[in-house]
Amino acid sequence: MMDVDRSIRVAVDTGDVTLGSEKSIQSLKLGKGQLVIVAANTPKDIVEDVEYYTNLSDIPSYTYEGSSVELGSVCGKPFTVATLIVNDPGDSTILDDLR
């Protein structure tokens, strides 16, 4: 899990990442993004929306093993992050790591 944490942090720091459920779902509806990451404790209705739109847009999703608090911390944010979309991984190898 540490490698995933580091890859997420590098993507946040050097790439283009959209944080938050509403913005993530909006991006999925438009078919934007390369990878969706969902925290393990994300509410069921949000998970269902993410799964529905990832299936429509063929964007892969990954369930982060930690909570939204832990995912927020990994992103370097002082708030919870239930979902995020990696638009551009930057220097991160996250797309290769999770495939």
Curated annotation (Swiss-Prot):
UniProt gene name: rpl30e
UniProt name for this protein: Large ribosomal subunit protein eL30
PROSITE patterns: RIBOSOMAL_L30E_2
The keyword Protease belongs to this UniProt entry's keyword annotation: no
The family this protein is said to belong to: Belongs to the eukaryotic ribosomal protein eL30 family.
Naturally occurring in which organism (per UniProt): Methanobrevibacter smithii (strain ATCC 35061 / DSM 861 / OCM 144 / PS)
GO cellular component, one term: cytosolic large ribosomal subunit
Family matches, as Gene3D superfamilies: 3.30.1330.30
Keyword tags: Ribonucleoprotein, Ribosomal protein
GO BP field: translation
InterPro entries: Ribosomal_eL30, Ribosomal_eL30-like, Ribosomal_eL30-like_sf, Ribosomal_eL30_CS, Ribosomal_eL8/eL30/eS12/Gad45
